[in-house]
Amino acid sequence: MPKSLLFALASLPLMAVELKVDHATVAGKDVRAMQRALQAAGLACEYGGPHSNHATEMALTSFPDGSYLEQIAIQPNADPAAVAAHEWHKQLQSDGGPCAWAVRPADLGAEVTRLRAASIQVSEPKKNGRKRPDGVQIEWEAAQVGSGNGNFFPFLIHDFTPRERRAYPSGKPTTTDFTGVSKVVIAVKDLDASIAQFRRAYGFPAPERQDDPEFGAKLAWFRGTPVVLATPLSPQSWLEARIREFGETPCAFILGAARVMDVHKPAAWFGRHVVWADSAKLGWHLGFETK
């Protein structure tokens, strides 16, 4: 067996790491316009307030499993320099839609150490926060994994204030029509190379694969995780154009549906039905998954 393969196998975690979505983020110019579009697609939203970075504000849709869908946008009277310096400035300034995702490990420090031991780059945790419209202050820290901030690997988040204040501004899930963020679909240039990166970072077994011509992608899903990798089937596809514009980032999010959805022709992804919202109206790709 080649030494390089032995080294790669030795660097894998002994057991696969459990990844549970803390939140998934959609970016745009105007948070209220984003809220209206989501509400038209059947999702209620709550305004969450401005961030302390002088660049962005957010709204969210939270779910019974604790995850939430963040709508992040440029705040009124934002500092142009702060917006330009923001990790997601391209998506913010061009209504780019899905841009990042986060997980909340039980022990952030231990997870940073584990990832670095697997030769995965992790930044030092950085403190952030925002004030809710009701005046409640929320504080957390986040660490960037890999070269992007939640673009490929999820960033890590740890709360200093009770997590419920961040996820449930009204004290309960925004909606019970959907169970949570079940899949994060990440657009990638090289499917095999991306699979290898996730397996090295998290110890996942080999993924299941399928093609979806209508979505325009070759797909790979790590069973039991939210991670779906998608590479374009055609150089002329919307997915190829998206990768050229934004790089390897989330291109779609899929929510678990709490009820059977009555549709004529759902997509079939890995044994489950996926119903897609109208991306032309919403401005990005959002799916609803049923058994």
Question: What is each residue range found by the language model?
Answer:
Residues M1-A8:
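Sec-dependent signal peptide recognition
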Residues V17-V21, V26-C45, F63-R209, P213-K291:
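Glyoxalase I/VOC metalloenzyme domain signal
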